[in-house]
Amino acid sequence: MAEGVVLFGVHKLWELLNRESARLNGIGEQVDGLKRQLGRLQSLLKDADAKKHESERVRNFLEDVRDIVYDAEDIIESFLLNEFRTKEKGIKKHARRLACFLVDRRKFASDIKGITKKISEVIGGMKSLGIQEIIDGASSMSLQERQREQKEIRQTFANSSESDLVGVEQSVEALAGHLVENDNIQVVSISGMGGIGKTTLARQVFHHDMVQRHFDGFAWVFVSQQFTQKHVWQRIWQELQPQNGDISHMDEHILQGKLFKLLETGRYLVVLDDVWKEEDWDRIKAVFPRKRGWKMLLTSRNEGVGIHADPKSFGFKTRILTPEESWKLCEKIVFHRRDETGTLSEVRVDEDMEAMGKEMVTCCGGLPLAVKVLGGLLATKHTVPEWKRVYDNIGPHLAGRSSLDDNLNSIYRVLSLSYEDLPMCLKHCFLYLAHFPEYYEIHVKRLFNYLAAEGIITSSDDGTTIQDKGEDYLEELARRNMITIDKNYMFLRKKHCQMHDMMREVCLSKAKEENFLEIFKVSTATSAINARSLSKSRRLSVHGGNALQSLGQTINKKVRSLLYFAFEDEFCILESTTPCFRSLPLLRVLDLSRVKFEGGKLPSSIGDLIHLRFLSLHRAWISHLPSSLRNLKLLLYLNLGFNGMVHVPNVLKEMQELRYLQLPMSMHDKTKLELSDLVNLESLMNFSTKYASVMDLLHMTKLRELSLFITDGSSDTLSSSLGQLRSLEVLHLYDRQEPRVAYHGGEIVLNCIHLKELELAIHMPRFPDQYLFHPHLSHIYLWCCSMEEDPIPILERLLHLKSVILTFGAFVGRRMVCSKGGFPQLCFLKLEELEELEEWIVEEGSMPLLRALTICNCRKLKLPGGINYITSLKELTIVGMKWKEKLVPGGEDYYKVQNIPNVQFINCDE
């Protein structure tokens, strides 16, 4: 039995009481009484959660428990925080302080008694409904046990897009042919119901060898139901012209003209994914010339959208899978596993499992998404009884499905089962994804910090960090096909995750059912129903516009998280709304990224939010921070990555619980920050020797990630300070001195024994010897280094390097050589803006695992002769080089690239 969301809250409260037992000394009797009742409550909740769909009264009891647990947490944490602040004031006015202390303790004891009484009443009510105590709790495998099992067998289910395709090979060929060879059409459309595989099919066409060779540039834009014309145009421009920098502030009419002209002059493929209505196309179409080299691949649930965009368009309607194809796909996910070497092996299929599986996939209605989710669920079950339990849960939907609605209900039942089967911590993680707008690329680090701020994930004594644990959670959700993860081999860690819109509907439905979250949009600001629900919700997600002003008094004063998602830089908090901070005293998570504050001042009332664990002001319009920030002593995450110059008072030193701190890039010249007390920091971004002392780093021994700007001649001190950071894995080092001073990079990073990712933007005429670097260094990014000697002979001997980027004058010599046997693990290489480079020799046997190569604006470079030796190469991107005529079919050097599946030319005709 999978544990419920409410049970997780009770478990967290239990842990809080245990963790703070010493500080609650003196009122132990009341605390012990509360813990006893919590123990009884936990045993009842396992049965109550299983019966919540059968009884409204049970659901009401669960909601009561949720509110009681939240109230108890608020009471306990407020008491502990007030006690800490009282002690902090010293011995002045001792008698008065003691009197207040005793009053607070008596009130706290009374409050705890009240909470205990409420829990007793709930327990009595539950028992009257026949809810049973389940003490054993051994009926479900914990996430930790599941992860241990997975680590032992190292299984990876075949859930990539490529392996999910069943019976569509001919369709891919036909669609690719129309895009490349049919000059009478501009638009190729793929239509079909949600979850049927339109995007998966489009992605296969997009990456088809013939398509990649034919077009000069590519853009992929998710449109969805909520979009702005400007945002779609911006995304198209950014993908077709990635080198042209930030265009977020470009006038819409100027952008329209530039994009129109661009599409007139080259062969570009634009994918518009999930266009809902014909009117949506009418809003977007102004940037597309009537007939030029551009083509469009469009996906929609509405078959008429493609015809409306181009009456001559080629339309392809996706079909549902047959029962046989559905089982074949499910089998792939459940029974085909890869070992550590990547070898695919089949697991023997039990006859009873196969019989049940073939019946269960009929509930998926032939939708690949539903089949994949069912497969992900069944892949966690290894015995016939476990499969039987899933079968019984789906059972009522196996018969009598005669209409489309019946089919959809059975499909949503399958998707919902994947949620119900999750361990309680993963339920919270999954529900948290409901905060994000449709098709939003969810930055996983941001997600992990949200979860940590709410106590959903925590670090462990064994050295497991919040990020480590968060990645385990996401891997589990991805294994179940409930999310997709974008993991770029250029980088150490996962960057983004996403949900399919049908899975998101399940997520939103469950979040509403659990009263987990309310989403507030400008378009619904006047909705009475929305206002009523806002008054109950503890979490609030605001999507776009100047919506915070519209919330008014409808927000529940006990809201714990308030997240704002901007679609454009248009949001502004006026002074009249600033009291809203005071009206939300229990906030733990506050994200005001890209918010504009009138007058550039963050209201001092921010200091009243003493429970805050997460505060993001990333790209907010702020010029002055108040000293009241010093009150936020429980902060774990603070992002001050503002736009422009800002005044920062020296109060950050008081936030000693911080795990993540991003400082502003530019502060007033007189700013001096003392940061040595921030001993729990794991990530410190934008640290500058101009505003703080390098010596402060000596105390931050838990740092795993550091970005640092050198503004003075402090390399010796810096080297010794970095040497103390024995846990450092990621280092970004930038030189801002004028004039630039030559460094010996190896001296700086010599003692960083766990370093895996290194970015250097320092003047360094010669690259250090390889023995100065940790052998497990995986990723290196060098720019503006002005290296005069070829760094490749040293870099290629770093045996674990997976990605190398040399850009913007990293190397100023004329010749580079990649020798035989060099770079044995390298997957990605980028050479960009190396203006003096003329010759690059690639010997046979070099870079045997290279998958992607980008050569950008190296104007003097001759076409490398050994590219054809790199047989592993899958993607070659050439930007701003005059090689296209030689490398296209029929060109004199085509043989060098003919076996590379994806060759892309960008701005190569100038």
Swiss-Prot record:
GO MF term list: ADP binding; ATP binding
Sequence ranges of the LRR repeats: 584-609, 610-632, 634-655, 700-725, 726-751, 847-871
Keyword Coiled coil: yes
One Gene Ontology biological process: response to molecule of fungal origin
Residues of the NB-ARC domain: 169-461
Induction statement: Repressed by silencing mediated by polycomb group (PcG) protein complex containing EMF1 and EMF2.
Pfam families the record matches: LRR_14, NB-ARC, Rx_N, WH_DRP
Effect of mutating residue 470 to E/R: Loss of victorin sensitivity
Coiled-coil regions, chain positions: 22-60
Protein's UniProt keywords contain Metal-binding: no
Keywords from the UniProt entry: ATP-binding, Coiled coil, Leucine-rich repeat, Nucleotide-binding, Plant defense, Repeat
Result for mutant: residue 437 to L/S: Loss of victorin sensitivity
InterPro entries recorded: Apaf_helical, Disease_R_plants, LRR_dom_sf, LRR_R13L4/SHOC2-like, NB-ARC, P-loop_NTPase, RX-like_CC, Rx_N
Domain of life: Eukaryota
Comment text on domains: The LRR repeats probably act as specificity determinant of pathogen recognition.
Family: Belongs to the disease resistance NB-LRR family. RPP8/HRT subfamily.
Function field: Confers susceptibility to the fungus Cochliobolus victoriae by conditioning victorin-dependent (victorin is a toxin synthesized by C.victoriae) induction of defense-associated proteins.
Protein name: Disease susceptibility protein LOV1
Native source organism of the sequence: Arabidopsis thaliana
